UniProtKB/Swiss-Prot annotation:
It catalyses: hydrogencarbonate + H(+) = CO2 + H2O. It is an enzyme of class 4 (lyase). The active site is at 86 (proton donor/acceptor). This is Carbonic anhydrase 4. It is a lipid-anchor; GPI-anchor. Zn(2+) binds at residues 113, 115, 138.
Amino acid sequence: MQLLFALLALGALRPLAGEELHWCYEIQASNYSCLGPDKWQEDCQKSRQSPINIVTTKAEVDHSLGRFHFSGYDQREARLVENNGHSVMVSLGDEISISGGGLPARYRATQLHLHWSQELDRGSEHSLDGERSAMEMHIVHQKETGTSGNEVQDSDDSIAVLAFLVEAGPTMNEGFQPLVTALSAISIPGTNTTMAPSSLWDLLPAEEELRHYFRYMGSLTTPACSETVVWTVFQEPIRLHRDQILEFSSKLYYDQERKMNMKDNVRPLQRLGDRSVFKSQAAGQLLPLPLPTLLVPTLACVMAGLLR
C-alpha cells in the first residue's frame, strides 16, 4: 500500500485511452494532446510548490539539521526498474529508511526516479544560485507513523524526498552502471526489467559528504503537486560521465512509437513566496576552525623556534 500511494502521488500511473487529457512536460505539450506544466490542475497552482531556486547565501542555518541515519542503503539487490512514461523509476524495498536530519519521524523509501535533459546545464529541477545541473535524482520516502493513513496523507510532512543534483564528471561512475545498462530494456512506456544487483550507496556520494544540505517545505513536482513534502537538497553532487548522462535521453522514449526521446522531464521553477529555506551548519560555507585548533600548531611552532 505504501508503494502504491507513492506511485499515485507522483503521477506514475498512466490513464487509459478515452480518459481526459493527461499531464505532460512542456516539450511534449507542443506535439501531443496533453496538459503542459502551465495547465496542470489539482494542487499545482497553490503557493508552496516545488522545485525552487535556492539562494545559498539567504538560507538560514538550522542547528537541528544534523546527520541523517540511513538504514538499508547498503543492501545489494536486483531491483525492478520501469519506464513509467515520465521518467525511469526504481522500486525500493520496505527495509530501506531514513531518520535524523531534522526529520520528525522515520521515513520508509518507496522509489527513486530521475529528471534530465540533453543539455548538461538544464536537466535538474532545483537550482542553486540560479545554476542548474545535468540531472536530478529523487529518493522518495513515506512517513512511518502509527496514525491512520488519511492523517498521514493529509499532513504537510508525509513525504520526504532526498534530492541529489547530478553533474558531468571526467570518469565513468561504475555504481550507476547497472541502472544505465538497464535503460536499453525499458525504452518505451510501460516496460520494466530487473537491474543487476546494487545498493543505494553505489549511486550516492560518500556519506560524509551528505552533512551539507538545504531544507524547505514544498510539493511533489508532478500532479497532483500535493504540498506534503519535506525537501532535502544536497550540496554535494553525484558525478556521472557525460556519456552515461546522455544514455537517458537517447535510450528512453515518451511514446510507444519511439518518436519522442524522453528528455527535459523537468517542471519549471516555482516561486518561494513566504517560505524559508534552511541549511545544515556546513551547507554552502566552510565551517570556521575552533580557536584551540588554530592555536595549538601556532604555539608548537613558536616553542620549536625558541628551543633551537
